[in-house]
């Protein structure tokens, strides 16, 4: 299968859409009109350069509807095997695995992808891929976009990113396949690879084909991030979505593995004399994530490093635990169901904190966790 296929039943009316989403028609109309007020905005730092990215998180009512849209619509689509990211069993590792042991690897990045996806193209997904009626398609488009764009942080945004090129990407895939090339896309990262060395003309042709597809959607390729690597070049990193693909399976580079060992060494030294500061908690969590990545990629060193980290897990001091107890009592006295999104976030954070308390006081942690969990809705 080279083209996305919707396996659900087309929705023909707004009343049918309301029924599918499990809400009354009047409430659906109200939510559509209030979408612009239904997001929380914040910034996160991404990448090595700590670039700030705007994130828009839907509030509780809209989030519930978007999750329902995912379940009833986007999760009923068969996605082509060349798509990776935000799909079950398909992530940056499976994406890199497509391009192992290749002679030539070309990586391209779509500029400012999510905010550049137009409302018109989102509507086309519902209307022309799912075959929904025009008014249903427009209503759904309003529910999953913000200010005429696809918001980063929206529950449906990554599905939309995967489906944007539904009517043209399969043509590009087939064209490249006929040329003996492998193609994959991890959301905004496009990779093409070859079992043979490509000539300059062939590489130029491949890149032009990708440009042609994305330009149809008023998008562009970030030229500064375009890379072309060759296995015969000893200085080449041969990297796809951050992983080394020179051999049969994706791996971390030696430099990355060495850096992770160094981080764990620093963590072990610091953990020998204090494990309760915020700085130590942040360092340990960072190390833990890196070691988990090593484990997923089959690096045997991960077992040893995980054992070291398990002996120096972060803890809280008595002062912090006293503050948590007071805060938990406040939540238990003041919070009453149904909880707001903010209250749910606070309790989730508190449960995380009491997991850490459990490392030094299991009975206390168990007591407060049981009480706090009782406040949460079924999820």
UniProtKB/Swiss-Prot annotation:
Instruction: Using the record's annotation, list all stretches that form the Reverse transcriptase domain.
Output: 1-245
Select a single GO molecular function from the record's annotations and give it: RNA-directed DNA polymerase activity
Q: Which reaction does it catalyse?
A: DNA(n) + a 2'-deoxyribonucleoside 5'-triphosphate = DNA(n+1) + diphosphate
InterPro entries annotated for this entry?
A: DNA/RNA_pol_sf, Reverse_transcriptase_msDNA, RT_dom
Q: Which UniProt keywords apply?
A: Antiviral defense, Magnesium, Metal-binding, Nucleotidyltransferase, RNA-binding, RNA-directed DNA polymerase, Transferase
Q: What EC number(s) are associated with this protein in UniProt?
A: 2.7.7.49
Q: Which residues are listed for Mg(2+) binding in this entry?
A: 109, 188-189
Entry's Gene Ontology BP terms: defense response to virus
Q: Name any one Pfam family assigned in the record.
A: RVT_1
Q: What does the UniProt record say this protein does?
A: Reverse transcriptase (RT) component of antiviral defense system retron Se72, composed of a non-coding RNA (ncRNA), this reverse transcriptase (RT) and the following cold shock-like protein. Expression of retron Se72 confers protection against bacteriophage lambda. At multiplicity of infection (MOI) of 0.02 cultures slow growth when infected with lambda but do not collapse, at MOI 2 cultures enter growth stasis. Responsible for synthesis of msDNA (a branched molecule with RNA linked by a 2',5'-phosphodiester bond to ssDNA).
UniProt record similarity statement: Belongs to the bacterial reverse transcriptase family.
Task: Please report the name of this protein according to its UniProt entry.
Answer: Retron Se72 reverse transcriptase
User: What does the record give as the organism's lineage?
Assistant: Bacteria, Pseudomonadati, Pseudomonadota, Gammaproteobacteria, Enterobacterales
Gene behind the chain: ret
